[in-house]
């Protein structure tokens, strides 16, 4: 085998090895894909109307306004014989809406949840972890709360799925 051809084979082999190494390194550094939001948190994806309501303040009046908005929307579309799916997404100080120890509206949430299967209450796991750390004890949530990794990301996901966005 002539030396020139042997050099060419060596160079091609080295180039292929380098290429495979780069692909393997890039794959190893690619962060794992985040799991999509839990299916349990989806209210009714087939609902004709879909609404996301944001609560990010620890204010009883804002929490009640969010619940009023939800109930008014439910009543409006029920009167028209149409379905609506509503997710109330809490994060930051708004997580108090779903905290078992500090929610000023937990009885109302329980009542509304029992009456409306297409109404979901979403709690931000990031906020829950931060509040637990700051308080030095686990933050427990009411039973109606469904925990998602990030409240803000959940709002983004809902908007990309065609949910109308409301911030009372």
Question: Which residue ranges define each predicted feature?
Answer:
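Acidic helix-start/capping segments at beta-turn-to-alpha-helix junctions
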Residues: 84-98, 127
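Bacterial N-terminal signal peptides that target proteins for export
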Residues: 2-13
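Acidic/histidine-rich, surface-exposed loop or edge segments in extracytoplasmic proteins
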Residues: 44-58, 89-93
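Short, glycine-rich nucleotide/cofactor-binding loops
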Residues: 55-67
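Bacterial N-terminal signal peptides
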Residues: 12-21
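Boundary at the C-terminal end of the N-terminal hydrophobic targeting segment
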Residues: 24-30
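A cross-taxonomic marker for long C-terminal extensions/tails that follow the last structured domain
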Residues: 99-168
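Histidine-anchored nucleotide/phosphate-binding helix
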Residues: 64-79
């Amino acid at each position: 085998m002539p030396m020139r051809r042997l050099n060419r084979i060596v160079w091609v082999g080295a180039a292929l090895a380098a290429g495979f190494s780069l692909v393997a390194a890039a794959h190893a550094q690619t962060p794992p894909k985040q799991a999509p939001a839990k299916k349990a948190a989806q209210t009714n994806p087939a609902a004709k109307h879909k609404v996301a309501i944001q609560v990010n303040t620890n204010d009883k009046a804002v929490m009640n306004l969010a619940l009023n908005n939800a109930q008014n929307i439910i009543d409006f579309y029920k009167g028209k014989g149409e379905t609506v799916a509503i997710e109330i997404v809490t994060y930051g100080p708004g997580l108090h809406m779903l905290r078992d120890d500090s929610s000023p509206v937990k009885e109302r949430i329980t009542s509304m949840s029992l009456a409306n299967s297409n109404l979901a209450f979403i709690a931000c796991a990031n906020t829950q972890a931060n509040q637990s750390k700051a308080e030095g004890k686990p933050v427990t949530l009411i039973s109606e709360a469904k925990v998602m990794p990030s409240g803000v990301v959940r709002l983004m996901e809902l908007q990309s799925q065609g949910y109308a966005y409301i911030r009372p």
